[in-house]
């Protein structure tokens, strides 16, 4: 499976009143990606491990009029748990966490496997690669670190500021194999431009009006 990793090094996760967490910068980049990818008439799935991030992304998309009423079948946001059994042409995975000491749901092998295997054509992972590189030593974290290192080798690890993150859907067969191997290993073990910060108070997770 062709994949890219975007190192969102400037983002910081925050804890919501419901104890779920979100990441403003990852949400903003996610919406920017959707704006670019919708021109290709693809079904886009946005998945994340946290309900607060789903709400934030949905609210930001609505605020920017990214998804008109009734078109949520083409672009949708969901938690990993709710997404099981579903697929999309493109999956944008927002990892959210930026802590080097706590991986949270990233250390859950079942959730991680689901998140890495739902894309038909392209997987885009948004994460703080620097934080993950300094994370724990569980099998799942080691696999994530290996995925990041492989992305570096294949020149598919981008900084959040690089326009290359909107590149074409091409990848070598060995890149596809690498992602599949990681998944198998895990299985076995207004006039004002809206910002993410301005969308936190809205509660709905639906993408239609």
Residue ranges and their predicted role:
Residues 1-59:
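Conserved helicase/translocase motor-coupling segment
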Residues 14-16, 55-57, 86-88, 100-103, ...:
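Switch/connector loops and helix/strand junctions flanking conserved nucleotide-binding motifs
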Residues 23-29, 53, 84, 108-111, ...:
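Helical mechanochemical/support elements of P-loop NTPase systems and associated helical scaffolds
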Residues 32-33, 76-79, 109-112:
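Eukaryotic intrinsically disordered and solvent-exposed regulatory patches
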Residues 43-45, 62-79:
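Conserved RecA-like helicase motor-core motifs
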Residues 50-51, 77-83:
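Conserved helicase motor
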Residues 61-63, 102-208:
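Helicase C-terminal subdomain and adjacent C-terminal extension
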Residues 78, 86-98, 114, 122-125:
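A short beta-strand element within the Helicase C-terminal
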């Amino acid at each position: 499976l062709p994949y890219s990793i975007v190192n969102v090094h400037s983002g910081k996760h925050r804890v919501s009143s419901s104890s779920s967490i979100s990441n403003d910068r990852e949400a903003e980049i996610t919406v920017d990606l959707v704006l670019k990818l919708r021109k290709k008439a693809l079904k886009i799935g946005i998945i994340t491990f946290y309900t607060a991030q789903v709400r934030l992304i949905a609210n930001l998309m609505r605020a920017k009029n990214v998804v008109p009423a009734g078109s949520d079948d083409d672009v949708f946001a969901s938690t990993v748990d709710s997404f099981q059994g579903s697929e999309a042409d493109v999956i944008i995975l927002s990892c959210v966490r930026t802590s080097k000491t706590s991986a949270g749901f990233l250390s859950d092998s079942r959730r991680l496997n689901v998140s890495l295997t739902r894309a038909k054509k392209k997987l885009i992972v948004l994460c703080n690669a620097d934080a993950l590189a300094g994370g724990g030593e569980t099998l799942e974290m080691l696999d994530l670190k290996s995925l990041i290192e492989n992305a570096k080798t294949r020149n598919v690890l981008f900084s959040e500021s690089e326009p290359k993150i909107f590149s074409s859907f091409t990848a070598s067969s060995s890149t596809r194999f690498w992602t599949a191997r990681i998944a198998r290993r895990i299985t076995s073990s207004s006039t004002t431009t809206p910002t993410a910060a301005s969308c936190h108070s809205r509660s709905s997770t639906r993408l239609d009006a």
